UniProtKB/Swiss-Prot annotation:
KW Magnesium (keyword) present: yes
Active site residues according to the UniProt entry: 175, 630
Keyword Phosphoprotein: no
Species of provenance: Prochlorococcus marinus (strain AS9601)
NCBIfam families: PRK00009.1
GO cellular component terms, semicolon-separated: cytosol
Name of the molecule in the record: Phosphoenolpyruvate carboxylase
Uppermost EC category: lyase
Cofactors, names only: Mg(2+)
Length: 989
């Protein structure tokens, strides 16, 4: 059996001596094998190493695929439970080490691209009929982008106007939740840092390098002895802690650098263009505020989340301010100080006599240090007050509190707003400037304050539309209206809602006991008002309505907001931005009609916030990728979202309203995921205009934000794509022939997808039996239930996340490609010459290119031989014929789709033009095979035991007790394989 090193050395086309990924992969291989040999029994370690080597060496040697896979199956089926669990853990560890390595290499490549100033590439090779720059698959840096824009004669004024209006918001979510434990993430960070040190080998002595390798191995050995599985179902606050980890460890320090890189790139190409605002790229969060289908997200949880976010920011500011105090040792003996700063010191001396007495002697000639001591005390008092609020809950009224002796002091001296903190820092900055000093640390802290404030990220409230209509229905029942709300037509609802919105008298009685659900719906709005009073409007000003179907869905939320004091009728201003989320294909088609009804209502238009120098009203709209894909398939979902954007932008322009589109993209292709750069470039022209809002799913946070340079790479990628799309107009969206072709492809694809998924009565059983969907639900990874309705087992109740997760685990990846081949084939059957048009679209239309690229990448991860094994082994005998038929339909569609994708792209093999991606996917596809077979083996044994009749514990003999224990261990083994495959595939749902 050849080792990985031997295989690579014997196949020169698979490795480049200069490729850092291949070079360091050998280090990972040696590390993995070394850890197994030290942590596992000798025979077990050798067998696991042999199993992995078998998976790729046989394929490279040209062995029959079926033959070598049978060898793997034989080995897997011969393993006892302990060895199976060890194998699952070993392969999971391997893939996570490879992931860390690839992230490190990506980080290094970004550093090289950023530091490389030789970007003077001619744009002459760009197709003049395609959007300039859009044919570049790889993201460009700011320096390269601005150089090319200059070569394309983009006027400085046009670029500056865009930069000043630019508003990019990345919204962190917990769904799908990260499958890797927080504890493991910390270990991965330490491993990444050690790898980084080892990779600068030219600066290391032999002893230093050996020492680092020893530390690396010990860290991985500790990892091996750590439980990979969550021991309990995480609470919402656990999820909050996980998401905020990236702000604490990476983003707080990385964000100021992003603007700095724009400044440097502008200096080289557009020296007179003004920088965007410090907060041009900012953050939102759904973690702790998204209550759609998650009963654990209560008003109290959202309140505590806001307090926790402020706590983290105050901690960071205290550290930064303390560091500044150490740094700013300027003495009045040798430097002047502004009069404004000196006056502020006198004011602070009166307010903080204890600080003055403690610090005045030490800092008697060091005014900056004294000022920063006062600032530190204000921050600590703000922190003390925040802790009190967090412990007391959102209903607690500080003004009515009389028992706390320290409260008076806290209330009078804490920072009441981030503006007060900014003012103090500006005093220091301006004083330094007045004496010809420029402290970069002060500038950095000010930038951080502008970006994060005290709230860190805005919390979007999300709730499903029927929760509001149900609450209003209960209210109207109590009011005994002549026509009950649920009996009204849509037009009648709109009229009644507008009338009530214009009425100044309250509608909701204060002394009525509502049902628990309605009371909580009302309480959310009350809590939001309290949040805004305490934190300012920035903390929570967007209310997303999932499953929006009609204009009344938005007006209902506005009515409830009015009743809770979030709408000022006198000034006609709303403190809440109501955001409809259009999710299904039918709702996407209906979205322009819904918004047109609302835009015609003067009352509604008057409530929209006015933004920018133009002071135009702004409407935010969210587009859902997950449910539309689950509903109608990949092509139909993407095309209807594309069409909806164009229609909504045209509608907004006609009504002189600015539009901000909120893209609810998931981590996987089947939920709108994929490379952000390509996705943003593929947006219809005129729909961005420098404004975009995008979800960042929990499962991709680590791959984007775990390392500083990775975070900057992702942020620069998103920003350059937004600038590029906004400035380089793409008129091809309006080409009637292309649009008509896409509409036909979408409809045919949708029909074929729905015929299998929604119309085949056996598909649900197929999905439940041949994928680990039921076992996935037992993973303690999310506070949110996998199904929308408790106890429901129908497809409509299953969330899109576990839907995609199950297909990914079993190597079908069906939601990301099924129906594409039939749609393309139908066009070619009508006219074979259409292949030329499809090739033109692939070359010149970013949207179509993005579609084909995503399908190609997904197809490269599909393994129907492994999928067939899931069907044959896990499918029940009584369903064999129907399951065989379903598999045949899937297999036929896969082969058709693959052949046509290759024909359109002009390639011989998938991913042929992307060497790095092909190498990564190829390694994973080969090495993950044993893990799939192992999962099937464990699932089969687990389900066989589960089907046995339960036995009362009072009658358990020794053997039966062992059987019960083994069932638990089998589940554990199965869950470990789910972890491993998720790491190998690099996504869950």
């Amino acid at each position: 059996m050849e080792s990985f090193r031997q295989v690579k050395n014997n196949n020169v086309d698979l490795i480049s001596n200069n490729d850092p990924l291949d070079k360091n992969r050998l280090l990972i291989e040696d590390l993995w094998e070394s850890v197994l040999r030290e942590e596992c029994p000798d025979d077990q370690a050798e067998r696991l190493i042999q199993l992995k080597e078998l998976s790729y060496s046989k394929q490279i040697d040209g062995d029959s695929s079926k033959t070598f896979k049978n060898e793997i199956v034989d080995i897997v089926n011969s393993m006892d439970l302990a060895e199976s669990i060890a194998a699952a853990r070993a392969f999971s560890l391997y893939f996570q080490l490879v992931n860390i390595l690839e992230q490190r290499v990506e980080e290094d490549r970004y550093i090289q691209s950023f530091t490389n100033k030789d970007v003077q590439k001619s744009p002459d090779n760009l197709d003049p009929f395609a959007p300039a720059l859009a044919r570049q698959n790889a993201p460009v840096t700011f320096r390269e982008l601005f150089y090319r824009l200059r070569k394309l004669n983009v006027p400085p004024g046009k670029l500056e106007e865009l930069l000043q209006e630019m508003d990019i918001r990345l919204v962190f979510t917990a769904h799908p939740t990260e499958i890797v434990r927080h504890t493991i993430r910390h270990k991965q960070t330490r491993v990444a840092n050690l790898l980084k040190k080892i990779q600068i080998e030219q600066f290391l002595t032999k002893e230093e390098k050996n020492s680092l390798k020893t530390q690396l191995k010990e860290e991985v050995r500790l990892w091996w002895r750590t439980d990979e599985l969550h021991q309990f179902k995480p609470s919402v606050l656990d999820e909050v802690d996980y998401a905020l980890h990236y702000f604490q460890q990476v983003l707080f320090n990385a964000m100021p650098q992003l603007r700095g890189r724009i400044a440097e790139a502008l200096t080289d190409n557009y020296p007179d263009v003004q920088l965007p605002s410090e907060s041009f790229c900012n953050f939102g969060s759904w973690v702790g505020s998204d209550r759609d289908g998650n009963p654990s997200v209560t008003p109290e949880i959202t309140w505590r989340t806001a307090c926790y976010q402020r706590q983290l920011m105050l901690e960071r500011y205290i550290i930064a301010t303390s560091n500044l105090r150490d740094q700013l040792s300027v003495s009045m003996q040798w430097s002047q100080v502004s009069s404004s700063l000196l006056e502020s010191l006198e004011t602070d001396r009166v307010k903080f006599p204890e600080i003055y007495e403690a610090r005045a002697t030490r800092y008697r000639s060091e005014p900056y240090r004294l000022k920063l001591s006062y600032i530190l005390e204000k921050l600590r008092l703000t922190q003390e007050r925040n802790n009190l609020l967090a412990d007391s809950g959102w209903k607690f009224d500080l003004e009515g509190e009389t028992d706390n002796k320290n409260l008076d002091k806290v209330e009078s001296l804490y920072y009441k707003s981030v503006k007060e903190f900014t003012y103090d820092l500006e005093l220091i900055k301006n004083s330094l400037i007045s004496t010809d000093l420029n402290c970069e640390s002060v500038n950095t802290l000010l930038t951080q304050v502008h970006i994060f404030g005290f709230s860190l990220a805005s919390l979007d409230i999300r709730q499903e539309s029927t929760r509001h209509s149900d609450a209003i229905q209960e209210l109207t029942n109590y009011l005994d209206l002549s026509v009950q709300y649920d009996q009204m037509s849509e037009e009648e609802k709109i009229k009644w809602l507008i009338d009530e919105l214009n009425t100044k008298r309250p509608l909701i009685p204060s002394d009525v006991h509502w049902t628990k659900t309605t009371e909580e719906t009302f309480s959310v709005f009350k809590m939001v008002k309290r949040l805004q009073q305490e934190f300012g409007s920035r903390i929570c000003h967007s209310y997303v309505i999932s499953m929006s179907h009609s204009a009344s869905d938005l007006l209902e939320v506005l009515l409830l907001a009015k009743e809770m004091g979030l709408l000022d009728q006198n000034s006609q201003k709303s403190k809440l931005l109501v955001v409809p989320l259009f999710e299904t294909v039918e709702d996407l088609k209906r979205a322009p009609e819904v918004m047109e009804k609302l835009f015609k209502l003067d009352f509604y238009r008057s409530l929209l916030p006015k933004v920018g120098e133009s002071f135009k009203p702004l409407q935010e709209l969210m587009l859902g990728y997950s449910d539309s894909n689950k509903d109608s398939g990949f092509v139909s979902s993407n095309w209807e979202i594309h069409r909806a954007q164009i229609a909504l932008q045209n509608l907004s322009s006609r009504n002189n309203i600015l539009l901000r589109l909120f893209h609810g993209r998931g981590g996987s292709v089947g939920r709108g995921g994929g490379p952000a750069y390509q996705a943003i470039l593929a947006q219809p022209s005129g729909t961005l205009k420098g404004r975009i809002k995008i979800t960042e799913q929990g499962e991709v946070l680590a791959s984007k934000y775990s390392l500083p340079e990775l975070a900057l790479y992702n942020l620069e990628t998103v920003t350059t794509a937004v600038i590029q799309n906004s400035l380089v107009n793409n008129r091809l969206d309006a080409t009637p022939e292309w649009n008509q072709l896409m509409s036909r492809l979408a409809e045919t694809s949708r029909s074929h997808y729905r015929k299998l998924v929604h119309e085949n009565p056996d598909l649900l059983n197929f999905f439940q039996e041949v994928t680990p969907i039921e076992e996935i639900s037992k993973l303690q990874i999310s506070s949110r239930p996998a199904r929308r309705k408790k106890g429901a087992k129908d497809l409509s109740s299953l969330r899109a996340i576990p839907w995609v997760f199950g297909w990914t685990q079993s190597r079908f990846l069906l939601p990301s490609w099924f129906g594409v081949g039939t749609a393309l084939s139908s066009e070619l059957n009508l006219d074979p010459q259409q292949i030329e048009l499809l090739r033109v679209l692939h070359q010149r239309w970013p949207f179509f290119r993005m579609l084909i690229s995503k399908v190609e990448m997904t197809l490269s991860k599909v393994d129907l031989e492994v999928a067939r094994y899931y069907v044959d082994t896990l499918g029940s005998k009584e369903n064999k014929d129907s399951f065989d038929n379903i598999f045949e339909v899937i297999s036929k569609e896969y082969n058709l789709t693959k052949s046509l994708i290759l024909e359109i792209t002009g390639k011989n093999k998938l991913l042929e033009s992307d060497r790095d991606l092909k190498s990564s996917v190829s390694l994973r596809n080969k090495t993950i095979i044993p893990l799939g077979f192992l999962q099937v083996s464990l699932l089969r044994r687990l389900r066989d035991q589960t089907r046995q009749p339960p036995i009362s514990e009072f009658f358990l003999d020794k053997d039966e007790s062992t059987r019960a224990y083994s069932r638990s261990e089998l589940l554990r083994g199965a869950l470990l394989t789910i972890n491993g495959i998720a790491a190998g595939m690099r996504n869950t749902g």
